[in-house]
Design a protein with these regions (language model features):
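N-terminal assembly/interaction segments in proteins that build large macromolecular machines
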Residues: 2-287
Length: 287
């Protein structure tokens, strides 16, 4: 059966898939557009599933603030090149628009809503694309929340204050983005993290060969410095290092209730292979 160029064009516009893939699908289903679209969707799902095993550690972050909630979402691709592709940018924009119309409290709900579009994008770009994580903060006034999104869309933070002060909120959100605190105060530091750091400090102290009481003081000093570095209230304010965040809040008669910080790819284990190694490995497989 002869497949017309107009049919291929129509299917491409509906599916976003390449011309050759569209033509193959139309030939297989004897020119039926609806059946061809179903076939491409099925193939997209299979390809997306195969690619989902590949590491996606690049991408962008989107932030939205409404009258009673703020949301951050991380959308991943395998490479920065793909993250700058027009179709990826459109996918991220569509997600941002969804955040405007619906309050998502669970990333799985968002994933379900965009899964079909994600599969099409995987088919189009040829990379693993994932909606990785989402954070939503609810409040009774948008002036109680501060958000910051870096110009490259790869680093963001949001903070909820006890009292209205959107300028202070933005300053603290910017500080959180840059300084990466683990918690608001010492009580919030994960016990496993503190235990791991303590073990490292103790090993370092033993290597010094000093007396037991001196080693103990060395460990205590390092723990104290560590906690100052990783707790928000103890950190020096990035815009004015002469005061701490605690003092900044005290001067404004305000408190931090909670915060979230996203950095694209943070915590994702990426292979250390360089490009040449990957090419060589692929050639060996093909051979």
């Amino acid at each position: 059966m002869e497949i017309k160029a107009s049919q291929v064009k129509e299917l491409r516009e509906l599916s976003g898939v390449g011309m050759m893939e569209c033509k193959k699908a139309l030939v297989e289903v004897e020119g039926d557009i609806e059946k061809a679209l179903d076939l491409l969707r099925s193939n997209s799902a299979l390809k997306a599933e195969k690619k989902s095993a590949r590491v996606a550690a690049d991408g962008v972050i989107k932030v939205h603030v409404s009258e009673n909630y703020a949301t951050m979402v991380e959308i991943n691709s395998e490479t920065d090149f793909a993250a700058k592709d027009d179709s990826f940018i459109e996918f991220a924009k569509n997600i941002e628009e969804r955040l405007v119309s619906k309050k998502y409290l669970d990333v799985e709900d968002l994933k379900k809503d965009v899964e079909e579009d994600r599969q099409k994008l995987v088919q189009s770009i040829g990379e693993n694309i994932q909606v990785r994580r989402l954070a939503t903060q609810e409040f009774d006034s948008p002036k109680k929340v501060g958000t910051y999104l870096h110009s490259d869309n790869k680093l963001a933070a949001m903070v909820l204050l006890k009292e209205e002060n959107d300028e202070l909120g933005r300053d603290i959100a910017m500080h959180i983005s840059a300084s990466a605190p683990l918690s608001i105060n010492e009580d919030g530091v994960d016990k496993e993290v503190l235990e791991r750091e303590t073990n490292i400090f103790e090993s370092q102290a033993k290597e010094s060969g000093k007396d037991e009481n001196i080693m103990q003081k060395m460990v205590e000093g390092k723990i104290k410095r560590f906690l100052k570095e990783v707790t928000l209230l103890s950190q020096d304010f990035i815009k004015d290092p002469d005061i701490s965040i605690s003092k900044l809040l005290e001067n404004s008669d305000n408190e931090v209730i909670s915060f979230e910080r996203f950095k694209v790819g943070e915590g994702i284990e990426v292979s250390s292979k360089d490009f040449a190694e990957e090419v060589a490995e692929q050639l060996n497989k093909d051979g």
